C-alpha cells in the first residue's frame, strides 16, 4: 500500500497520507512511515504552509521504530531528476503545485492558464483543469466538460488541432488525454453518489474509443494519477453493480463489445458471475473484502463507498423479499454471512424507506397485502392531519393578530379621547381670555363717557 502512494498526483498523495493517519491505519511503524512520507511531500515544495504538518510530525515522533529504505519508502527529493520530470509533466511548475497543495485553486488555475498559452494542446489543458476542479470539489464544472469535448471533437476542430500540434505531440497522446477527462467525469459522479450516471457514462465513453480506454486501464500510472488502477476498476465495478438491476446482469455480461473490458476489470466479471448464480454469500465476502479494502482507503472515493456498500446489500435483501412472502432475519443472516443485528436494522430501514408491503414481527418478515384503497386512505389521512396542523397554526396566528389589532385600536381611541379633552380645555381658556378682553374694552368706553 505505502509503496503505491507515489503513483498519485502530489495533492492526492498528501491527502491520502493524511486520510490514512486520521483513520488510524496500520501499526506504529507503518504510521511512522506515513508521517515521514508526508513530511517529504511538504519539504518537496518550499514556501507553503501544510495544514497536516503537525499530524505528520506527531506520527513520526510517536514511533521509536527506525524507518529504513528497506521498508519500501525511498522517496527522492525535489532535486531528483526523475521526480523533477514528474513535476514538470504537463506544464506543472513549483508555483502551481504550491497553490494546489495550499488549497488556492483559483491562483493555480490562473497560473495554469498562463502556461496553457504556450501549449497548443487544448486537451492537456482541459485535463489539468478537470483535476483542479476535482481537488476543489467543483464537480459540476467537471461534468460540463462533456459538452466541451463534444464541441472540440467535431470534425473541423479535430482538423485544426491536428494542424496545430507540435512534432512531439501525436494523436495517441491527445486521445489518452480525452479518455482521462472522461474518466474524471465518471469519477465526479461517483464521488457525488450518482452511481447510475457514473456507470452509464463510463460504458458510453468506452464504446466511443475502446482501444484508448483499454490502454489507460492496463497501463502503469505515471505519478500524476487521481486514482490508482485498482481504485479505478473497483469504482467502475461498484457503480455498475449498484445501479444496474439484478435481472439485467446476465444481459450485461453477454455483450460482445464488452468482453475485453470484463477480462481487464476482473473484479466486475467475478462479481457478476457470483450474483447471476445467486452466490450472494460468496459475493458479499468479495464485496466486504476487496471492494471495502480498495475504496475505503481511497481519499476521493471513501465517503461515496459507504453509501454504495449499503445500497448493494439492500438490493440483495429485496431479492429475497421478492421470492418469499415470509422469511426470517436469522435465515438471511446465516445465508448471507451478515451479523443478525445488522440484517434486522437494514431490513427495517428498507421496509420503512421504500414503503414496502412487509412488516417485521420479531424475527419474522411477512408480506402484508394492502389494497390501493388502503394506501389512498392512509395518504388522505396523513394529508388531513397535515392540513389540520396547518389550520391550527393559522388559527393561533390569527388570534394573536386580532389581539394585537384590538390593543392598537384601544390605544388609538384613548389617544383620541385625550386629544379631544385637551382641545376642549384649550378652547375654554381662549374664550375666557376673550371675555376678559371684551369686558376691559367696555369699561374703557364707560370711563370715557364719564370724563366727557
From Swiss-Prot:
Its main location: cytoplasm. Component of a COP9 signalosome-like (CSN) complex. Keywords: Cytoplasm, Nucleus, Signalosome. Coiled coil: none annotated. It comes from the Eukaryota. Component of the COP9 signalosome (CSN) complex that acts as an regulator of the ubiquitin (Ubl) conjugation pathway by mediating the deneddylation of the cullin subunit of SCF-type E3 ubiquitin-protein ligase complexes The CSN complex is involved in the regulation of the mating pheromone response. PCI8 may also be involved in transcriptional and translational control. One of its GO terms (cellular component) is COP9 signalosome. It is found in: Cytoplasm; Nucleus. The keyword Cell division does not apply. Residues 205-374 form the PCI domain. The gene is PCI8. The keyword Cytoplasm applies. This is COP9 signalosome complex subunit 11.
Amino acid at each position: 500500500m505505502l509503496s503505491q502512494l507515489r503513483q498519485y498526483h502530489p495533492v492526492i498523495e498528501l491527502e491520502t497520507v493524511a486520510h490514512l493517519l486520521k483513520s488510524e491505519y496500520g501499526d506504529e511503524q507503518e504510521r511512522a512511515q506515513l508521517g515521514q512520507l508526508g513530511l517529504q511531500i511538504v519539504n518537496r515544495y518550499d514556501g507553503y504552509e501544510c495544514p497536516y504538518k503537525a499530524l505528520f510530525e506527531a506520527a513520526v515522533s510517536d514511533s521509536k521504530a527506525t524507518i529504513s529504505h528497506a521498508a519500501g519508502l525511498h522517496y527522492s527529493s525535489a532535486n531528483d531528476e526523475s521526480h523533477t520530470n514528474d513535476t514538470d509533466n504537463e506544464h506543472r511548475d513549483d508555483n502551481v503545485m504550491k497553490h494546489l497543495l495550499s488549497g488556492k485553486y483559483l491562483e493555480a488555475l490562473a497560473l495554469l492558464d498562463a502556461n496553457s498559452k504556450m501549449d497548443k494542446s487544448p486537451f492537456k489543458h482541459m485535463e489539468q483543469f478537470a483535476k483542479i476542479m476535482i481537488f476543489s470539489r467543483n464537480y459540476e464544472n467537471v461534468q460540463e466538460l462533456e459538452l466541451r469535448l463534444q464541441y472540440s471533437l467535431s470534425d473541423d476542430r479535430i482538423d485544426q488541432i491536428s494542424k496545430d500540434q507540435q512534432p512531439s505531440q501525436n494523436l495517441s497522446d491527445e486521445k489518452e488525454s480525452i479518455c482521462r477527462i472522461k474518466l474524471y467525469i465518471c469519477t465526479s459522479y461517483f464521488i457525488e453518489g450518482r452511481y447510475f450516471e457514473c456507470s452509464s457514462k463510463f460504458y458510453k465513453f468506452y464504446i466511443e474509443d475502446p482501444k484508448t480506454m483499454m490502454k489507460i486501464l492496463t497501463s502503469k500510472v505515471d505519478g500524476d494519477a487521481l486514482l490508482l488502477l485498482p481504485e479505478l476498476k473497483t469504482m467502475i465495478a461498484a457503480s455498475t453493480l449498484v445501479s444496474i438491476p439484478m435481472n439485467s446482469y446476465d444481459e450485461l455480461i453477454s455483450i460482445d463489445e464488452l468482453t475485453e473490458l470484463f477480462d481487464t476489470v476482473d473484479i466486475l466479471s467475478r462479481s457478476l458471475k457470483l450474483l447471476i448464480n445467486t452466490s450472494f454469500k460468496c459475493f458479499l465476502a468479495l464485496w466486504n473484502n476487496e471492494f471495502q479494502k480498495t475504496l475505503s482507503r481511497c481519499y476521493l472515493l471513501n465517503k461515496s463507498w459507504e453509501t454504495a456498500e449499503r445500497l448493494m446489500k439492500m438490493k440483495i435483501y429485496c431479492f429475497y423479499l421478492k421470492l418469499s412472502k415470509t422469511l426470517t432475519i436469522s435465515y438471511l443472516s446465516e445465508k448471507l454471512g451478515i451479523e443478525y443485528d445488522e440484517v434486522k436494522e437494514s431490513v427495517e430501514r428498507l421496509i420503512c424507506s421504500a414503503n414496502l408491503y412487509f412488516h417485521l414481527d420479531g424475527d419474522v418478515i411477512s408480506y402484508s397485502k394492502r389494497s390501493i384503497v388502503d394506501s389512498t386512505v392512509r395518504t388522505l389521512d396523513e394529508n388531513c392531519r397535515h392540513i389540520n396542523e396547518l389550520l391550527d397554526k393559522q388559527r393561533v396566528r390569527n388570534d394573536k393578530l386580532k389581539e394585537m389589532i384590538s390593543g392598537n385600536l384601544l390605544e388609538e381611541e384613548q389617544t383620541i379621547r385625550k386629544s379631544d379633552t385637551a382641545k376642549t380645555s384649550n378652547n375654554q381658556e381662549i374664550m375666557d381670555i376673550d371675555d376678559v378682553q371684551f369686558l376691559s374694552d367696555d369699561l374703557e368706553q364707560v370711563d370715557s363717557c364719564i370724563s366727557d
